[in-house]
Amino acid sequence: MQRRTLATTGLALAAAAMLGLPGQAAAQETIKIGLIAPMSGNYARPGQVMKMGAELGIEDINAQGGIAALGGAKLELVVIDTGDTTEKAKNAAQRMVAEYPGLVAATGAYLSSFTLAVTEVTERANLPVLTLSYSDLLTQRGFKYIFQTSASSGSQASQSMPTLISLAENAGAKRPKTVAIITDNTAASISSVKRMKDDLLAPAGLELVVDEVFTPPLADATPLVQKLRATRPDMLFFLPTVISDAKLLLEKMNEFGLGQGKIPTVSFGIAIAEPDLLNTVSAEMVEGVIAVVANWGSKGHEAMIERLEERYGEPWMTQNAISTYGDMWILKAALEKAGKADREAVATAIRGLDEGPSPYYPGGELKFDETGRRVGAGLTIIQWQNGTPITVYPPELAVAGPIWPKN
């Protein structure tokens, strides 16, 4: 669909140039797109990877002619650092709307708690914001200028529960009957866990035997892992957001003889699959660990993954890179539809998008419902195999089959 749009608008531009219509033939000044994400502090790494995805997306769009409806105007990325606290994120959003009044749209802000704070500010400024954050609350506030490309935490939990049980049974393991939950208290994690406990565990025949919440950064994982050792659940739902917390928990599980598949471990979110996890945790320690994520570089993205590695040294393409890359194409489509670099027009255009399936997000369509959620947004299940987190579900994106750790 993007190719057809580019071809059509390219012909229109050529015709306009021949007819001497200066408004169509002359490119406008650059169109500024914001990326508001952590570039410093504890969460700097994910924010920097989001920047990589945005840069590649803008590079590709500009190389293919920019925004045809605006005379080939090029996109320009403006990066705003949220820092590493909710208060800093809110201040960054206030600074963004004050210092960059020409922004037509933005993407960000990584942690759901940051995105909740940022969008309180951007909503008042009528600035459309795309986000890969998970929390259900993001699109339950009646806001009109936030657009959630990821499946929400609750949706991911609903989709993943029967899928995980099927993966276990299809791999020849016994059907899980007991489950432990160890989670941090970030907004996305709490949203996922609430949905599990309220609506999903009992219908799936799962008994909750450990239910622990901690505040990052975690100082000592021993008390949490001791409860796992005492109960020996059939499955562990493991929801850290910070890599250092994941490291402490995995190390302690291995120390207590519970790691490397002895308790099948399922994480939600990408912290457990970040490349720099291997800087401090061995590949053997994470072998078999599964993660449910909203997006991942998968089958069909090989060329993009290769570019990311060549340009930035990234060994694989996490959600932060591919979703932010895709966001640039959403904003291009909206600008083409809007026909002007105006934030209100762009927001209206995003609400009206109906582009069918997207190559940059799993499941569903490039279309948003009245709350701002992407229609039919799916999920991706990845698993550490031989030192790399690879896609094992859905089948159309999988690069290998899942291996379910045996009890």
Question: Could you tell me what each predicted segment is?
Answer:
Residues M1-L11, A16-L21:
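Twin-arginine (Tat) signal peptide motif
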Residues Q2-T8, A27-N407:
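Extracytosolic ligand-binding ectodomains
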Residues L21-A27:
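Sec/Tat signal peptide C-region and signal peptidase I cleavage site
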